[in-house]
Amino acid sequence: MIEATSCGGVVIYRGKILTLYKSYKHKYEGWVLPKGTVEEGEDYKDTALREVKEEAGVTANIIKYVGKSQYSFCVPEDTVEKDVYWYLMSANSYYSKPQREEYFVDSGFYKFHEAYHLLRFSNEKQILEKAYNEYLDLKKANLW
């Protein structure tokens, strides 16, 4: 078994959530939240911000840590167990530009119910729901 760690962001601008569409050689297709692997010497917050910038072209600010998701997948002759640490983030505009080199072909900011139904993976839906509720609480308290 191989253990891996990634970090990502639930990025919100004016109540809408950033999602990315990945299409990899017709083997993997679907809407996801931006996330990626921690590089050597990098802390989790820096990883999350870097991945949002690289994958979506979005400059974001971390508001707070919202939780961890876990999943596993198979690679030739082994299984990867991955932990993903998620942060609630704010963006400064609706601008996004998907990173084609990583097979992202579309990106955009969507209303909660749209983003929730677009997302391919249930663990990302759970994180989205938790992060969005945190956002609503902050907004209600005039802290967003």
Language-model features and meaning:
Residues G8, Y13-L18, Y44-K45, Y65, ...:
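A generic structural signal for ordered secondary structure
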Residues H117-W144:
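Charged phosphate-binding loop/patch that engages nucleotide di/tri-phosphates or the phosphate backbone
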Residues M1-L33:
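N-terminal strand-loop-strand
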Residues V38-Q126:
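Unchanged
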